[in-house]
């Protein structure tokens, strides 16, 4: 479900160009799910190759990373490991949502309502066997490093911002902030023009950056207190949150009482969750100890062969895209040489 801190954090609109020459630690699963959900045909079906294997994730990774590298951005993808045991309820909740959406999708198709069909199809998105391996293979051709987190990917991404190995973490979820990320970038892998469902209207989605310390200063909270605000609203580890408590009420409660244990009206509900363990997951998460982040040269031939010959991508489109990347990187290299 992610954490609903949208109305509380200090968000500043920015551009992708602002992250040139910066390492950005991307929540890999979050990005890949976005590609799988959004890159679809008019009927809501995902893109696929000649053997029927889904390729929407590969298409998203191809075009986004070409864009990143062309702008001088240095992406690092952080993949999830084993989820904390407290996440089981949230995982089951997501499965049920997908099952319900599948029924609605089939009805929309039968009714000929393609707008609803596409909407419900996006809600059925799931990571199939092999997609993670395929994504890592494509990243290797790009020369883009990826990291295997021991548990939640966004926690390791947050950790990298604190070791100075990354400028910011990138995810649509706000959890990185509770995990201690110095900066969080939203709309990083899905910026662009998007159609509003059921309306003939488009909006421009732009990246936004959240400086954690600015948010804490604005709210006059410590990180520990913000974690308690998050628990009141609902996290992946207590997805239902607390009854009749939204972001503003949660903030008011913590500003008045400082911590969960001191809020009289929630004590009965508080006994139903392991709030101490949830705090621990955010304050002291399991993270990967990354010695060095190494970027390699792009393997243009290997990438083209994989996408065109093995995954049925258009040869003209792939080669055109890779040529654009090659020219952009050559231009940046020439500009750099002029300084020496």
UniProtKB/Swiss-Prot annotation:
Cofactor: how bound: Binds 2 magnesium ions per subunit. They probably participate in the reaction catalyzed by the enzyme. May bind an additional third magnesium ion after substrate binding.
Positions of the UniProt region annotated as N-domain: 1-98
Gene3D superfamilies (alphabetical): 5' to 3' exonuclease, C-terminal subdomain, 5'-nuclease
Gene Ontology terms: biological process: DNA repair; DNA replication, removal of RNA primer
Coiled-coil segments on the chain, per record: none
Residues reported in the UniProt entry to bind Mg(2+) 2: 173, 175, 236
EC class name: hydrolase
Entry cofactors: Mg(2+)
Assembly and binders: Interacts with PCNA. PCNA stimulates the nuclease activity without altering cleavage specificity.
Family according to the record: Belongs to the XPG/RAD2 endonuclease family. FEN1 subfamily.
Name of protein: Flap endonuclease 1
Source organism (scientific name): Nitrosopumilus maritimus (strain SCM1)
């Amino acid at each position: 479900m992610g954490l609903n801190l949208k109305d509380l954090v200090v968000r500043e609109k920015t551009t992708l160009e602002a992250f040139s020459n910066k390492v950005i630690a991307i929540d890999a699963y979050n990005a890949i799910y976005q590609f799988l959900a959004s890159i679809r045909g008019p009927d809501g079906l995902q893109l696929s190759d000649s053997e029927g294997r889904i390729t929407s994730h590969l298409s998203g990774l191809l075009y986004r990373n070409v864009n990143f590298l062309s702008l001088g951005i240095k992406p690092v993808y952080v993949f999830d490991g084993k989820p904390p045991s407290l996440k089981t309820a949230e995982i089951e909740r997501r499965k049920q949502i997908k099952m319900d959406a599948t029924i609605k999708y089939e009805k929309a198709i039968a009714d000929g309502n393609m707008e609803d069909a596409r909407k419900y199809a996006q809600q059925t998105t799931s990571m199939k066997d092999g997609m993670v391996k395929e994504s890592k293979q494509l990243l290797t051709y790009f020369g883009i490093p990826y990291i295997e987190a021991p548990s939640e990917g966004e926690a390791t991404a947050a950790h990298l911002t604190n070791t100075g190995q990354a400028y910011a973490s990138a995810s649509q979820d706000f959890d990185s902030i509770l995990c201690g990320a110095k900066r969080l970038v939203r709309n990083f892998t899905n910026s662009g023009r998007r159609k509003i469902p059921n309306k003939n209207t488009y909006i421009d989605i732009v990246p936004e950056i959240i400086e954690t310390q600015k948010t804490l200063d604005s709210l006059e909270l410590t990180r520990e207190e913000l974690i308690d605000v998050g628990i009141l609203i609902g996290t992946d580890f207590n997805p239902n949150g607390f009854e009749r408590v939204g972001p503003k009420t949660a903030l008011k409660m913590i500003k008045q009482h400082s911590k969960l244990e001191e809020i009289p009206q929630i004590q009965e509900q508080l006994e139903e969750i392991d709030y101490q363990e949830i705090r621990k997951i955010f304050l002291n998460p399991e993270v990967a100890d990354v010695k060095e982040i190494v970027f390699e040269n792009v393997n243009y031939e290997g990438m083209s062969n994989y996408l065109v010959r093995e995954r049925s991508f258009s040869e003209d489109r792939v080669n055109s895209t890779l040529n654009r990347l090659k020219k952009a990187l050559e231009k940046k290299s020439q500009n750099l040489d002029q300084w020496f």
